[in-house]
């Protein structure tokens, strides 16, 4: 969305070979898939697959997050949110700028879904990195409740005991579900990005309004 105004090495997860190739083509900004190309628009309109715990522990996933962040914060074409399908990877992963938090950080969400919409709506201008040069007004819920999966990771560290014996300890975060209530403009960003995961573009919402 545009603003208008320590790992398990070698773990592949469920990423297909073409996605791995796209992710590993570099380390910086990724090429955005847009509606200007029929094949890419068809891809953007597909429903993305959920991520598994093994995906979150893969090198491909970590590099994808790094490159998605570089893409959405690119000064040549900055945004306030991005979804994995926009860079050619059909999985349920988004990054959202949290304007409701101190420092307005970008945060990633695995398998996000909206479990409740407020009845109160707001209408505001939206743009999209995948739909160049188009801005229009869209109605969105003012408040939403989202659920998502925690980012899984495995970290190995070595500790020395009192007897001088070195031992390796693995620390693993659970792939558990979390819920959060989001309000205001940040809620709008979440709705826009989660739409991408379901093959819905903001211009479809404009048509709904009309």
Segments the model singles out, each with a brief description of its role:
Residues 1-9:
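Sec-dependent bacterial lipoprotein signal peptides
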Residues 10-210:
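Positively charged
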């Amino acid at each position: 969305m545009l603003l208008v105004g320590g790992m398990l090495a070698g773990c592949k997860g469920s990423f297909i070979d073409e996605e791995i190739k796209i992710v590993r083509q570099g380390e910086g900004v990724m090429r955005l898939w847009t509606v200007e190309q029929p094949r890419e628009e068809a891809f953007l309109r597909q429903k993305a697959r959920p991520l598994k715990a093994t995906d979150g522990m893969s090198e491909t996933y970590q590099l994808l997050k790094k490159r998605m962040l570089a893409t959405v914060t690119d000064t040549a074409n900055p945004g306030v949110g991005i979804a994995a399908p926009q860079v050619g990877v059909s999985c349920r992963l988004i990054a959202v700028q949290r304007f409701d938090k101190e420092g307005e950080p970008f945060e990633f969400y695995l398998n996000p879904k909206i479990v409740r919409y407020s009845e109160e709506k707001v209408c505001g201008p939206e743009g999209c990195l995948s739909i160049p040069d188009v801005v229009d007004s869209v109605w969105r819920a003012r408040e939403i409740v989202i659920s998502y999966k925690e980012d899984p990771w495995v970290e190995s560290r070595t500790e020395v005991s009192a007897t001088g014996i070195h031992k390796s300890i693995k620390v693993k975060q659970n792939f558990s579900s979390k819920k959060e209530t989001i309000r205001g403009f940040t809620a709008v960003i979440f709705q826009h990005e989660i739409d991408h995961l379901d093959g819905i573009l903001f211009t479809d919402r404009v048509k709904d309004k009309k």
